[in-house]
Amino acid sequence: MAKIVKVIGREIIDSRGNPTVEAEVHLEGGFVGLAAAPSGASTGSREALELRDGDKSRFLGKGVLKAVAAVNNEIAQAIVGKDATNQAEIDQIMIDLDGTENKSNFGANAILAVSLANAKAAAASKGLPLYAYIAELNGTAGVYSMPLPMMNIINGGEHADNNVDIQEFMIQPVGAKTLREALRIGAEVFHNLAKVLKAKGMSTAVGDEGGFAPNLASNADALACIKEAVEKAGYVLGKDVTLAMDCASSEFYNKENGMYEMKGEGKSFTSQEFTHYLEELCKEYPIVSIEDGQDESDWEGFAYQTKVLGDRVQLVGDDLFVTNTKILKEGIEKGIANSILIKFNQIGSLTETLAAIKMAKDAGYTAVISHRSGETEDATIADLAVGTAAGQIKTGSMSRSDRIAKYNQLIRIEEALERAGTPAAFPGLKAVKGQA
């Protein structure tokens, strides 16, 4: 038994200068797990609650001392003495103790930090790397794959202070044979994009996720700049590198008139018109994945979009599904989208996250493991992507240490598996729904 002997919570700072919760779980034998909760900017309305203090005299109301107190008191008292290797039991104890549907009592930030720290401590007690332990918890011990990165190299929407409506323009280095090669291709395109933007007299300041955040005449302009950068780097768009977008449509959907208002372009679309706008972009550019291409509540619009694009484009539900199995189940039954974005803190525990990934895979949906715009040096999502053989990861651009921490962890894992004589496959484009 890997007995929990101590649980510690503290307030640390994330990549946006806001507080977040970090937890330590200590076991008998001196094993320790350390984990921090991330934080989103464009959030789905049905996400588990991130508990903030609301005390305007500290961190403009964004302190997390209440959540930290929950870790140090109620949660610690409930799980000290328990077996850390019973992850589902530890998570359920915290969920039951919180007693709310959306974890609003302790905060998903408190519960998640402890959940992940517990898994790390348990892995250490078994002498396993975290990805191997996650695979065991997932019922897929020894089954790994290296994820295809979706690299957000132009930031807009809520992630940048510019006039670009679509939140993320991403590249996928599908021509790579290994994760390390994919990162090299991504870095080369990123540096060439900086040159392209500079030559046009545009800003090369970066947004929350490390991508550039220039003012552009249109969303299509972002794709044109990326195309030029890919070619300047010596790669072929559509063969070596494909494109993906996160529209985060809920951020520019007007609930009062049901229109998608792209203020940066001065255009408004009905739900169906917006799907056809995206369809035209897909005809012009090799866009193989679109995330949140409709408002989270516009299920009719999503059903139409799935009918129009779903056979050839990966349609990822983020704000739509919020890593929640109840909502995902309904989406699967109604044929909404064909992929789910996986964010630990949308649901608030490792056990529930693994359940969402399993449900998606069982239904033939893909699962894309994702960071949040507010991150720390915690790289757990890298281990999650490998340990569940998810096939895809979204963790920002080729700048900002909070993003690079995840990529560097993936490099370490890929190398460790190669050295052990059990290299993990890198599926590339085959990992993307509709592209196999």
From Swiss-Prot:
Q: Which InterPro entries match?
A: Enolase, Enolase-like_C_sf, Enolase-like_N, Enolase_C, Enolase_CS, Enolase_N
What does UniProt give as GO cellular component? Answer: cell surface; extracellular region; phosphopyruvate hydratase complex
Cofactor remark from the record = Binds a second Mg(2+) ion via substrate during catalysis.
Give the EC class as a word.
Answer: lyase
Could you tell me what reaction this enzyme catalyses?
(2R)-2-phosphoglycerate = phosphoenolpyruvate + H2O
Q: What does this protein do?
A: Catalyzes the reversible conversion of 2-phosphoglycerate (2-PG) into phosphoenolpyruvate (PEP). It is essential for the degradation of carbohydrates via glycolysis.
Q: What's the protein called, per UniProt?
A: Enolase
Supply the source organism for this entry: Haemophilus influenzae (strain PittGG)
Q: What is the lineage of its organism?
A: Bacteria, Pseudomonadati, Pseudomonadota, Gammaproteobacteria, Pasteurellales
Instruction: List the gene name.
Output: eno
